[in-house]
Amino acid sequence: MSQLPAVSSAPQTGAASRDRRLPQAEVGGGRRALPGPARPGETRGRPMAAAREGPAAPAAAARGGRVAAAREGRAAAARGGPGAAPRGGAAAREGPAAAAASREARMAEVARLLGDPLEEEAPEGRPRSRAGGLAAMPYMRFRHPLSVLGINYQQFLRHYLENYPIAPGRIQELEERRRRFVEACRAREAAFDIEYLRNPQRVDFDILTFTIALTASEVINPLIEELGCDKFIHRE
């Protein structure tokens, strides 16, 4: 009677160990059946299957990778398309605006470098705009090029007259010659008008005489010599 529990316990231990060695599988997920030892037939068949699939396996894998990448690219484009279009439109709108702002800034800088108009050069009754940019351009009058050197036209003329004292005399002499020439022309014209009233048939001859007298007058000859044009005139 005392050995019955021992005898009855031995088969239970063996059954439990056999149950642990057997592959277990549960319905609805859980531990799956553990792979058992490979059979001799399967071991011999694996190298042959690998040899048959060897050339085609990399190509199939590459095709599968490309197909998957193409599907992922289309999906990403479909997801980002509606959002990317507004972003692209905003960038396209910001491009001209940024270019216009940069151009206006450059023009304002050029206006600042050229300087504001002098107080005495400002037009009367016209508002003076001190704001930078394109708003100041219509009312801005550029300075004389001599202002780049830091002097104005009056200072330059004074400097020229002080360093070249002969210049005023030459200018006055030329002005006097011009005045005498104009007066002589008016006098000759009046004389020819009177002569035309007396004898209209002599008009052509008088015109020729006037031309000869004009080119040989004491007013023109010194002026021609002064300007250096006498060397280009063939005199007989």
Curated annotation (Swiss-Prot):
| Omega-N-methylarginine: residues bearing it | R63, R79
Quote the biased-composition stretches of kind Low complexity, using this chain's numbering: 32-68, 75-102
UniProt KW Iron keyword: no
Record's keyword terms, sorted? Coiled coil, Developmental protein, Differentiation, Methylation, Myogenesis, Nucleus, Repressor, Transcription, Transcription regulation
Q: Segment Disordered: which positions?
A: 1-102
Tell me where on the tree of life, at the top rank, the source sits. Eukaryota
Coiled coil stretches, renumbered = 170-190
Report, as the record phrases it, the tissue specificity of this protein. Expressed in heart, brain, kidney and pancreas. Not detected in placenta.
The subcellular location is:
Nucleus
Gene Ontology terms for molecular function: SMAD binding
Q: How does it assemble?
A: Heterodimer with EID2B. Interacts with the C-terminus of EP300. Interacts with HDAC1 and HDAC2. Interacts with SMAD2, SMAD4 and with the MH2 domain of SMAD3.
Q: What is this protein called?
A: EP300-interacting inhibitor of differentiation 2
Organism of derivation: Mus musculus
